Amino acid sequence: MEFSTQTTASLHLIKTSALAVGVYADGVLSPAAEQIDHASNGAIRAVTKTEFRGRAGATLVLRNLAGISAQRVVLVGLGKQEEYSVRAHSGAEQAFAAYLVAAQLTEGVSTLAALPIENSTMRDRARAAAIAAGQATYHYDATFGKPDREALPKLKKITQIIERAEAAQTQQGLREGAAIANGMALTRTLGNLPGNICTPTYLGETARKLAREFKTLIKVEVLDRKQVEALGMGSFVSVARGSAEPLRFVVLRYNGKPATARRTRGAAGPVVLVGKGITFDAGGISIKPAATMDEMKYDMCGAASVLGTFRALAELAPALEVVGLIAACENLPSGTANKPGDVVTSMSGQTIEILNTDAEGRLVLCDALTYAERFKPSAVIDIATLTGACVVALGGVNTGLFSKDDALASALLEAGRQTQDPAWRMPLDDAYQEQLRSNFADIANIGGPQAGAVTAACFLSRFTQAYPWAHLDIAGTAWRGGKDKGATGRPVPLLMQYLLNQAA
């Protein structure tokens, strides 16, 4: 989809299929709505007195208004004026884009990004608008026998009305938002695909497709079981052993720096993103309940977010180095699967007692985190649907953020704030490490019923002593259940904004 900008002082002269103007709660009109209301002899105030009160996300369409060139004026509810934020703006833009899709329109014009918001820039609002439009236009039909929207016209263009002085800032924000939205779309589709299609091999092939599409920016290596065993990744291999699907260890390298500016001795290393890629998690011998087991196809959303971030990176081509690592396999019960009480040796040399085979994400991540050392990274961020305990603690609003590095944690929190993809910093005190004590190995893979999200992060921290590290537990934010079941594309916005901030 194309995003563009236009500067005009005469909104009533804009020729478009649909023009969006904002209305705050209790019928308070935005400046754009005031202008259209004046040009149409009070058409907007006539409806705000009765049927449209500006509830956040609500829309009302006024057609063929006298004195207005736009075919439709779409009133978009903004909520209370004193509470209007970038998050509310994102919701308003998404509501407008959703209307354009539902009405089968190919283009529209929005005045919403021009509304001032405290502690935000035009770039922030433009980025939010493009991400919101991408979310509204995303549609999954990969596994339907007949794509249900094949014949419908597609939304091709949204134009933002802005001040001339803000053109460069707006265009930059729209470009960033469009790339992030494309990365989120890839992440969502990978998450939504069933486990019999999106296998470890499929993830490897998706990485290779990215490398072919962006061959000057992305290089990919896909390792098989024999190569992984040669590296000593005994913990990762032990999880994969229970399934007939072959494991894959995917290494992506992005370098947007000019050849003359490539890394020299002593320069900062790359940022490394590590994604958990359990393409289906039945729990292994410690099998999960059947009722919601279908949702365990989403256990690879950490890996999907790495791939989505790399897509967005390649589209924007910022001048930095990023490595992506994906440890992909299935976790199934079988005669060759891990058993409770088994002891395995990780790539780091530390031995692990497996007390619960359904705590497998940390078993694949620990070897990937050890592998990350070879890149001498400036920071390592792992992304994983790791614990149900994090869902209990934070629900579906905030991603759980664990790190002992204050600077890294603050940078990630700020990136989440900038993109309305929030995270919440959780404790990582050494006192929790005692729960992971084992009588038969260096460490146990679970720490009992208390503080499950924290002890999972504590487990991972044992393998991250060589570099600054943060862990994102996305178990509550990577997908939604219920009637709107589906992957969300988070935390691609947070990750991309963090990387863009590093390149700035």
Swiss-Prot record:
Cell location: Cytoplasm
Predominant location: cytoplasm
UniProtKB keywords: Aminopeptidase, Cytoplasm, Hydrolase, Manganese, Metal-binding, Protease
MF GO annotations: manganese ion binding; metalloaminopeptidase activity
Names of the cofactor(s): Mn(2+)
Catalytic activity: Release of an N-terminal amino acid, Xaa-|-Yaa-, in which Xaa is preferably Leu, but may be other amino acids including Pro although not Arg or Lys, and Yaa may be Pro. Amino acid amides and methyl esters are also readily hydrolyzed, but rates on arylamides are exceedingly low; Release of an N-terminal amino acid, preferentially leucine, but not glutamic or aspartic acids
Enzyme Commission (EC) number: 3.4.11.1, 3.4.11.10
GO CC terms in record: cytoplasm
Pfam families from the UniProt entry: Peptidase_M17 (PF00883), Peptidase_M17_N (PF02789)
Domain of life: Bacteria
The keyword Cytoplasm belongs to this UniProt entry's keyword annotation: yes
Sequence positions that bind Mn(2+) 1: 281, 358, 360
Binding positions (Mn(2+) 2): 276, 281, 299, 360
Listed GO biological process terms: proteolysis
Cofactor binding summary note: Binds 2 manganese ions per subunit.
InterPro entries: Leucine_aapep/pepB, Macro_dom-like, Peptidase_M17_C, Peptidase_M17_leu_NH2_pept, Peptidase_M17_N
Active site feature: 288, 362
Protein's job: Presumably involved in the processing and regular turnover of intracellular proteins. Catalyzes the removal of unsubstituted N-terminal amino acids from various peptides.
PANTHER family given in the database record: CYTOSOL AMINOPEPTIDASE (PTHR11963:SF23), LEUCINE AMINOPEPTIDASE-RELATED (PTHR11963)
NCBIfam families: PRK00913.1-4
Record HAMAP family: Cytosol_peptidase_M17
Family, similarity comment: Belongs to the peptidase M17 family.
Protein name: Probable cytosol aminopeptidase
Natural source organism: Bordetella avium (strain 197N)
